Amino acid sequence: MDSRSLKQLFSIPVIVAALGYFVDIYDLLLFSIVRIPSLRSMGVADSEMLAQGEYLIRAQMIGLLLGGIIWGIMGDKRGRLSVLFGSILLYSLANIVNGLVTTVDQYALLRFIAGIGLAGELGAGITLVSESLPTRLRGYGTTLVATVGLMGAVLANYVAKTFDWQMAYFIGGGLGLILLVTRISVFESGIFLKVKEQGVDRGNFLQLFNRWDRFKKFMGCILIGLPIWYVIGILITFSPEFAKAMGIAGVVAGDAVMYSYIGLAAGDLLSGFASQAVRSRKKTVFVFILLSLVFITAYLYWPFQTSSGFYTGCFFLGLGVGYWALFVTIAAEQFGTNLRSTAATTVPNFIRGSVVPLTFMFGYLRASLNILQAALIVGVFTIMIAFWALRLIDETFSRDLNYLEKDH
């Protein structure tokens, strides 16, 4: 890569999007890390910890689902920058207030509001980066954003170990407000501004559903990511419960999140560079879905003896589902400029929202099976759906993004 390409790759939109996603991941995963100490401080019994945790993560995920639609439409109607400013302000303030809650219901309300705010960050950032970089660098740019962003999980774990859970939320909110100031120097996407001048219909959410070819691609984009949030939302979030079922003591959710996200960041680097090398998004995703199946089975049934061995399993879980950046890039590349933000923002949040039915399915199966068997059935289900969904999307590696979605 020559010096000109490197300069384009490390441009202000890419750096700001990467730092924004870093704070977004910190705030998004902080709940998984501080779930047990925060609920304990509110008087929740250990026997209720899993059920109350599922209630709170559902509230956050429903917020993400709703926020994905709101911010996605806004990104196409008002511009990518409006989302980058509005979303970070909402989730930063929500997280600061979250540090003051005293009841589980207050906690749920704040996770819901924070979820709405968190929904806008990644889609708007990836859309802006995809439209700002030349085709040959697009995959590298989105990979850089995701890899830097995912390391926010490492910071969240460090902060949660160093401070109490309330201060961890205050710090997350403060980081977001600081980042808000840095966004003043970012310019709007040139591709979007050209479309805005043309006066075409933009951000029409229903356009994703009114033609079979678009709807098919939209559903395919969502469902290829199903294993990613099954791993994060169930296997990692409830890792202390899985470790207990395996007879392993001393597993801390924060460490499980950290190691899985280090794996996820490594996977994103590998999948990003692999897709550039083989010049195919779909072939790379196929390989990583296959790896996910192997690592999910190993995590649940490998005879781990120690917590360090268990954390190694968490790392490989993350590595297997390390096609998150590719997943969001594919969503951005499938659709025209007038629908790109809507698609790229709703797709990752719809898949995050899939944690809601997946946790219900997991809970239902736990009533008649043990926790490991229930998790394996849900996991195999997500893998099968993802393989099928891969057939519904286009190969977009070399696609020029300067085009529109039209109904006529």
Regions found by a protein language model. Give the residues of each.
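Helix-loop-helix hairpin linking two adjacent transmembrane segments in secondary transporters
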Residues: 145-184
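Extracytoplasmic gate region of multi-pass secondary transporters
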Residues: 32, 214-265, 355, 359
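Extracellular/periplasmic helix-loop-helix junction of adjacent transmembrane segments
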Residues: 34-66
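C-terminal ends and interior cores of transmembrane alpha-helices
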Residues: 89-102, 290-304
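Helix-breaking motifs and short loop linkers at transmembrane-helix boundaries and internal kinks
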Residues: 79, 100-106, 134, 279, ...
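Helix-to-loop junctions at the C-terminal end of transmembrane segments
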Residues: 68-79, 268-280
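Conserved MFS/SLC helix-loop-helix module at the cytosolic interface between two early adjacent transmembrane helices
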Residues: 66-102
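Cytoplasmic membrane-interface "Motif A"-like loop-to-helix N-cap segments
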Residues: 77-87, 136, 277-289
